[in-house]
Each structure stands twice: as C-alpha cells, then as structure tokens.
Amino acid sequence: MYIGTFHSLCLRIIKEHLEFTRLKKNFRTLDAFDQSYTVFQNIYRFRAIKNFDTAVSNQGAWKQAGEICTLVNNLSEELIDPAVLMADADVRIAALGEILKVYQDILSENNLMDFSAIQTEAYWLLTNYPDVLAELRSKIRYIMIDEYQDTNYIQEQLVFLFGGEHKNICVVGDDDQGLYRFRGATIRNILEFPNKFDAGECKVIPLVINYRSNSDIVDFYNQWMVTTDGARFRFRWRKFRHDKTIEPHEKPALHSPAVVKLSSENDEDEWHEKILAFIQGLVSSGKLTDYNQIAFLFNSVKHQRVTKLARFLESNGINVYSPRSDMFFQRPEIRLIIGCLMLMFPKYVQGLENQEYQFLTPEHYRYYRGCIEDANKYLADPEAADFHNWIRRRGKLHFGLKEATDYGYSGLIYQMFEFSPFSDILSTEMNVGLVDLRPARNIAMFTQVINKFEYLHRISVLDPATYQGRRRVDQNTETPFNLYLKLLYDGGISEYEDDAEYAPSGCVSFLTIHQSKGMEFPIVVVDSLGNIPR
C-alpha cells in the first residue's frame, strides 16, 4: 500500500527507477528558497534571452528570480513543452519558452530537481517507459484521493495514468473548498471528474451532512452561497460548483450564539488587552484547560499587527505557536548566534559600521547592528567571560589570518556551542514540549542554513589568499551576511514545525486560514478580513 502526497509518491517512483529517469545518482531536491537562489545565481543566462523583458518585469535580480520560478513552476505543472512555446509567433510566448528551456538546462547540468519537477519527472518516466508503468499498475489496483478539489492538471494526469484500465478511482472533495488556485489547483478536476468515464461508470455519492460545524455556521454558509449567486454580485455559480445544501448533524441544545464579536475601534493597545482578557477569562472560568484549545486565524501570520499581538501575548505569559510567521530571525538565540559570528570577523564589522555594503538596506543595517548589540550585551556579563575571550581570540586570528584554517563558518558555530547559553539550550531534554525545544530546533535550522551556504559556494575553510586584490576570507564573509542571509531575511524563514503535533500543549496557535484547513479547535478567533469579501 502506498500512502502519501502526490509528491512523495512520485519521489518514491523516481528513486525506485532512477536509472530510467533523466537524473543521476545523488541528485539534489530544491526547496523554494534553493530554487530562487539557483535562478538568482544564473540570472545572467536568463537576461541574455531575446525579449526577456517582455516576459519578466524590469526589477532587481532577486525579484526577477522569484518571478521566473513562478513562471517555470506553472508551465511545468501544465506539462508545457518549451519547444512549442519557442516556436510561437508571439515574442513574449517565445521568450517564455526560452526561459523554461534555460531553466531546465540549469537543472540538468547540476543534477537538480525542484518541487514541481518531482511530478513532471515521474510523469515523463511513466509515459516513456511502458514496462515501468505496467509494473506500477500491477501493484496499484485501487486509488483513493482526498481533497481532490485542490489538485492541478499534472496530478489529474497522474491519477488516470496510475488508474489504467482498472479505473478503480475514488476521489473525495468539496468544490466549495477550492482554496489553492493560487498554487495552480483547479476545481475543474472535481467538477468534470464524472465526465472522464463512460455513462454509468462513475458513481457520485453526495456527502451533505456536516459533522464538524455548529448549525449556525452551516446555515450561514448555505445562505452565503445563495447570496453570492445573482445580479448583486454579478456572478452565477452554475458550472463552477455542484448544487447542494449542507445539513448540520444536529442542532445545539444551547440557544446562545456560536459566534461572538471581539473588537476595538482602531486602537491596537485596546485590541491587545481585550484579547488577553478574553483568554484569561476563559481560563479563570474553567472553559479553557490548555492554551492549545485556542486557534487564531489570520489572512497572514507575517503581518506586523499579527506579530505585535504574538509578542504582546508572549510578554504576558501566553506562548504563541506560529512557525510560519517568519519570526525566525527575531528569535533571541538566532540574533545571538549571528551577532557572535560577526564579532569574530572585525573587518566585516568595520564595513558594517561604515555602511560600506551597497546591497544592504537601512533595515538590514539595523538588524545586523542589533544582533551585534545583543551579543555584546550578553558577553559583557562576567559569567560569559570565557565565551567573550574565545570570541576575541578568534576575531584577532581572523583579522590577521596568515594561513588557511581547518574550519569554515559552520565549524565556528559548532565551536560556539561549547559555551553558554548555547550549551544549555542544546542540552534541553527532548520530552519537555515543543515550546521549550524551539530554541534548540531553531539553532539546528540555522546550522543547516550555514551548511547549505558553504555547500553552494564551495567553502570549507577560511582562506587568507588574495584574489582580485582582496583576501578570500573577507570576500567570503561578506557573502553569507550581505547576500545569503539577507535574502533569507527578506523572504522569511519558518521556524521548526512538528507535523505530529499541530497544536502543542501550552501554546495558542496563530495560523493562516489556509493552514488551518482540516484542523479542529474548540475555540477559534478569526481576525478581521478588512473590506473583503465585499
């Protein structure tokens, strides 16, 4: 039995039949940042494409890299052949084809595979090697797909490729919950699924009883679907959804409303205090026995007003679990590591003080200086004297470096772990709960980031050799701070997220509406959606 996502199943197929794919041994799979960074490193190849500016907007290299990634991901998942686009008379379409071809060449040359390519490579393998497909079909007799409304074109092709002549395919989904169009998903797949079979072959079983939501919420939902259909919204659902009326499993015995309003008149401090009082009131009344029974839903957990609320609650003793809020670089353990690492390279710090780095914005300068201030403040404590002296010795060594060291940047970080507070953090027992483990998890993620940087830039030691008039150690030290970490800081990086425990004990959860799908909480607080939907 195969159980997993489309991507995990495709990756398994690729690994089991690697010799038939276009990949070589030890291929590397790119995450979203790796993909953008790879394009960024090769941006000159894309900019050399004729009529490149008709397909990609005229902006900085990093933003162009992100735009290119979006384009090639969408084209790949639609199984578009770059040669077909390149032959088009429209110069923009032809340029898109060239962009896709250059991108595919980069992946091939470096034995790389991005997230989208996991599915396209599996599809290519199965359609080009009938024996492999036949072997797979002999193993897979029945296929069940959940959340079918969130599938895209290539996933639909894979489903029917796997299904073969058996056609034992069961899909479950709700066309009214198609939330992932922005990722390429299409509700067309579930709406038109019965049409893929001969008359009478496909049995449709309506599931209209809602066992999860309060009847007030179900009634509101049904009314909303009626309200949005017609002249008032200038829209007709018709072919865009299956006609249905959802029924609640039962009517509540209580006559009190399931939804209450908690708000303030554009006063952020009052808003914070009301939410705190609301949570504390639930605790004191006994209705709340663990903070993990509450979820806060937002359009974005990265918004400044959301992160301010998180900091306010944490300052009042209520832990917040929000791994995708991109607060990774604001965590004290990460700021301290960065600050201590910088202090070991005095020449870099001098350049920072003199604002010599043209690619850093005022925000980056403020952040890095803040990290150094945090480090100096910690090291000024007499109890940190050994750590302070060690950093000073390293800084003096690197300033006057005469011969290559036997360590790189990651090696320095690992050496730092001998000292408090890092030694204390990393010695935390693994069974104390996710919140207490968060600093250790974040430190582990940071070491992974630096290790990946060294791998991508082929750095293993600190080298004093001169290249183009400057020491390599000085050039290389600027790259992680002024480029790699800067881009990660700008793009955001999620903290450690435990898939086995989506609502860790002792924490209120801050989630996006998309992120919360499929989860259940006794108490849900929904942030204002502003003026949408109108």
Question: PLM features: what roles do these ranges have?
Answer:
Residues 153-262:
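Conserved RecA-like helicase ATPase core segment
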Residues 93, 112, 287, 385-515, ...:
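Accessory C-terminal helicase-associated subdomains
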Residues 3-10, 94-142, 152-158, 274-281, ...:
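Conserved helicase/translocase P-loop NTPase motor core
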Residues 147:
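Walker B catalytic acidic pair
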Residues 23-29, 105, 201-212, 230-298, ...:
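Inter-lobe coupling/hinge region of RecA-like P-loop helicase motors
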Residues 35, 111, 115-118, 213, ...:
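Phosphate/oxyanion-binding active-site loops and adjacent basic polyanion-contact surfaces
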Residues 196-199, 257-259, 284-437, 447:
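ATPase/helicase motor core of nucleic-acid motors
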Residues 1-120, 138, 167:
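A basic/glycine-biased coupling hinge at the interface between accessory DNA-binding modules
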